[in-house]
Amino acid sequence: MKETGVGYLNSQAEEVIDFQYEPYMGIMSSGLFYEGYAIVKSDGLFGIIDTAGNYKISAQYKQLIRLEDLYGSRQGDHWSILSLTKDSITPALFASINALGDGFVLYKENGKYGMMDAEMNAILPPVYRVIKKFRDYFVTLGCGNDL
């Protein structure tokens, strides 16, 4: 499957992980190893492997994205946030998620935005219409009745 599959070579161009995975949109960023882990696709589902090719998270998710030190997984219409360092996962509550940089994750719950840190602690509750990062601070717009 080397002609169409995805595998990994070391710096001497020696195969270290067999070409057994499927290509996917965004593989040249999400499929790269980060802190010893990479997102792979197998049988149409996404999982996470280590540098030896062992699954840390089996291929079980419809979609999987890296959010700096966290990962986002989608099952159905909602997202969960996974932490490999804490071996934990949030309930699938979020309509959308996105990395804001510096370890912060933006999430949308019940039509409103909130923010959490890399330790999965809520920094801002989901009560905002908009949260944007601008240089080294955040700009928020509340969801008050007069907006």
Locate the predicted segments by residue:
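Residue-level detector of conserved, function-critical positions
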Residues: 1-147
